[in-house]
Amino acid sequence: MKNSAPACDIPDLGPDVYAQWRASGIGATTERLEGRLILELVGDVSGCRVLDVGCGDGRLALELSRRGAIVTGIDASAPMIDAAKRRAQQHNANVTFQVAVAEHLPFPAEQFDIVTAITILCFVQDAAPVFREIERVLRPGGRLIIGELGKWSAWAAGRRIRAWLGSRLWRRGWFRTAKELRGLAERAGLVVKGVRGAVYYPRWGLAARLISPFDPALGRFTMIGAGFVALSAVKPAAGP
């Protein structure tokens, strides 16, 4: 990808890493909170054509399909797409998966009612082309739900430390504030409807257990310390 680090080029990231993360206590809690927020923002998807950009191993795509959406998932990583296809087969889900990059979506204009993009921009230095492509494939009135790693949180600080210590994964990481995400969406021609936060605890199991019950309430009132930032936006309807 131009100006980016495709997931397939990063040896630290793959289906097994995702599975290990979800199997941990803090990973399961974090996935639950992030997933609940994204699904709340996505809302009713019954009959909608949905594109999941950076679908990973297909977990969100399959949940959207289960809720009645017609789902296509793309990812830059062939191993991730293979894992997503296996997951779909295991669950007898009718979801289309293919290898593609977010900067060059292989779809006609105005193809989708909803686009989801979860934690992909953290591996993209120049995110503007991604937003432009998403705007292009959305139909007028279509919606974008994007979730990203927060820039100012205990989690982000830990990732920066790991980058300084030599992590190949986080040395290529790019974190953005809610304001920066809002600006990218608006410059692409989208109208931002809201920004919410999640994951207000540090990467420590006890803290997660103590704070996670209050996480949804915190996400409605402040972005300070959010480890996960979710933005919803809409493509303006065509004029008369």
Question: Could you tell me what each predicted segment is?
Answer:
Residues 163-180:
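Acceptor-substrate binding/catalytic loop of class I
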Residues 51, 57-104:
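Class I SAM-dependent methyltransferase SAM/SAH-binding core
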Residues 119-122:
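Short catalytic micro-motifs in class I SAM-dependent methyltransferases
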Residues 1-45, 59, 63, 83, 143-168, ...:
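Conserved class I S-adenosyl-L-methionine
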Residues 128-140:
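A short glycine-rich, Lys/Arg-flanked "PGG" loop and its adjoining helix->strand segment in the class I
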